[in-house]
Amino acid sequence: MDILNTVETFDATTHRMAETYTDTPDPERNRIVRRWHVEPIPLAELKAARKAVATAKRYEVETGGILMAGTVIRTDRESQGLINGAYGLARDMLAGGVPAAPIDFKGADGWAEIPPSVMVDIGRAVGLHVQACFRAERQLHEAIDAAEDAAAVLGVDIAAGWPG
């Protein structure tokens, strides 16, 4: 005897196919009609999934670079580390703890000699950019956590509020 699997149409953002079903014999066609049940996705799972999307968006924006005075500044994790090191060195140079000299730096557009004062500006801009990304992610996570139902969770605009 054949089994005809069916499932009612549902919104996959808020519901999913359950692991349960109802079988109805259809002897005229020598088959069983299996109707799979649909269940709402638990609110905690919806929230976790939306927060994961917000986190992925934060990483995308955080590491996507910034534009500063017409120059692209890389903000991937490796570049953040290199910029942070050069920023610390530039601050030491400006404070007189290290002899002042242009900082050799390889950026998105190639090699550059960056004056210490400009390197400090770049370091601050990158740091502020990264902080703004984490602030936006935190605000989204808090809004998702505060949502009382699926519609409110899905109503949180993950594309809004990012620096850039």
Protein language model regions, located:
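A preference for well-ordered globular domain cores
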Residues: 1-164
